Amino acid sequence: MTKKRFPGKWTVPGGRVTTDDYINLPKDTDECWYNILERVVRREVKEEVGLEIKNIEYVTSLATIDKEGTPILVISCMAEWESGDVVLQESETDQYAWVSSEEAKGYDLIGGIVDEMLMADERRNGRKSEWKKSM
């Protein structure tokens, strides 16, 4: 359960890209760093819940505006567990649960999360899907 932007709501691990995620790394080409999104997803999951993940895949994206009026682009991904046990970053999260997409419908989730979980299920089963509101 998240404590920050949506206190008391259930969600999935997440965060933001900062220049610290790549600025001190060697560039992959003369001008660019590659796989930054994947590095950030790995870092955020490790920081927030203590798990190592692999095989990160894009699910969908959304745009929102924060309280200060700043536009935010959210890129949702799915991944496979690689190693580790859940250890919560207490400043971010105070509870966790492993649930199916169907079970998630019984939780007070941030809007759209169940729909994203359903999309991830479709992709895991080899079917392409686009976001649609299910509830």
Write out the residue ranges for each language-model feature.
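Short aromatic-enriched loop/helix-cap "lid" or pocket-rim segments at secondary-structure transitions
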Residues: P7-W10, T70-P71, G111
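A short coil-to-beta-strand element that immediately follows conserved catalytic motifs
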Residues: G50-S61
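Conserved Nudix-box catalytic region and its N-terminal flanking loop in Nudix hydrolases
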Residues: M1-R43, E47
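Extracellular/lumenal ectodomain signal focusing on beta-strand-rich modules
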Residues: N55-E57, S76, Q95
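Charged phosphate-binding loop/patch that engages nucleotide di/tri-phosphates or the phosphate backbone
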Residues: V114-M135
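NUDIX/MutT-family hydrolases
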Residues: M78, V87-A120
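Active-site-adjacent beta-strand/loop module that shapes the phosphate/pyrophosphate-binding cleft
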Residues: L62-D85, A120-R124
